[in-house]
Amino acid sequence: MSRYQEAGVDIHAGYELVNKIKKDVKSTRRVGTTGNIGSFGGTFDLSVLNIKEPVLVSGTDGVGTKLLIAQKMDKHDTIGIDCVAMCVNDILAQGAEPLYFLDYIATGKNDPDKIAQIVAGVAEGCRQAGTALIGGETAEMPDMYAKDEYDLAGFSSGVVEKSKLLTDANPQENDILIGLASSGIHSNGFSLVRQILFKDNKIDLSEKREEFGGKTIGEVILEPTRIYIDSVLPLVKENLVNGIAHITGGGLIENLPRMFADDLTAEIDASSWKVLPIFEYLKKLGNLSQDDCYETFNMGIGMVLAVSEDKLESVKKLLSDKDEDFYIIGNLRKRKGNEEKIIVH
């Protein structure tokens, strides 16, 4: 055993991991991908995209303490989807097509089988998003993390024609707001979720509940974050949307106002969509107020589109063609005085 191994770092486990993930990484290749796994830097050829005035849009994010749920359940094959989703959905909100992705995994001990499961999830997220996994880093840090602990973060870059870049100046008065259904909690609010489940109560994650269709609580909580690229990017390319909001930490209350200018207000009808059972369960179990819920969770809406009234039917048709569940949840109007930028009825 080398002195480095005695110190807790096994470089041979790193080599083993690279061999295990090669197939998954290769499966994400797309137009513009160059090079192979193992290079010092990931490369991508922008010239093949034939974009006249390219604007690069980048995003970086992690999965937060949802990772602790995955580690508690010893289920690591979907958490990578969450990591990709958190990055590429943010990029999509600016109208950009995600091109490539890089991941960063930090752990107390490099277990090649476990890390390969995580990377398999990252690769699945990349395939869903049409983005290439062009690089990554696995850092073994025995004094920083416990043996079975790990953290996961990602970085992605996308591109958009300058004329199609979505900013808060695009949405207009009388725009219709379309909410796209979430798959569950997604990747935000898990510190509160864990407080409710494990500190305020002693919930067994393997318990199956009728309101969850027979799924266990753990399965519902770990449901991967939706990736909206396939259904929304075509709308952007056809100039059918004026704005996009990715509903993450802070829920609708914090994220929707980021989409439009300060002279507008979003009027939201909370009865216009079905709140997912997991949120009703957490609200009751945690004795949460309505404000607590809407300021923390997505409440069943993972993304919101601002659409001109004359383009509404075209958007609805294209979303339906993609089997996207959506709801008309409100509209934008002129803001009166110092009222809030979002009003939920």
UniProtKB/Swiss-Prot annotation:
Its EC number is 6.3.3.1. One of its GO terms (cellular component) is cytosol. GO terms for molecular function: ATP binding; phosphoribosylamine-glycine ligase activity; phosphoribosylformylglycinamidine cyclo-ligase activity. Gene3D superfamilies: PurM-like C-terminal domain, PurM-like, N-terminal domain. Signal peptide: none annotated. It is found in: Cytoplasm. It holds the Pfam family AIRS_C. It catalyses: 2-formamido-N(1)-(5-O-phospho-beta-D-ribosyl)acetamidine + ATP = 5-amino-1-(5-phospho-beta-D-ribosyl)imidazole + ADP + phosphate + H(+). One of its GO terms (biological process) is adenine biosynthetic process. Keywords: ATP-binding, Cytoplasm, Ligase, Nucleotide-binding, Purine biosynthesis. Pathway: Purine metabolism; IMP biosynthesis via de novo pathway; 5-amino-1-(5-phospho-D-ribosyl)imidazole from N(2)-formyl-N(1)-(5-phospho-D-ribosyl)glycinamide: step 2/2. It is an enzyme of class 6 (ligase). Belongs to the AIR synthase family. This is Phosphoribosylformylglycinamidine cyclo-ligase. It comes from Ligilactobacillus salivarius (strain UCC118) (Lactobacillus salivarius).
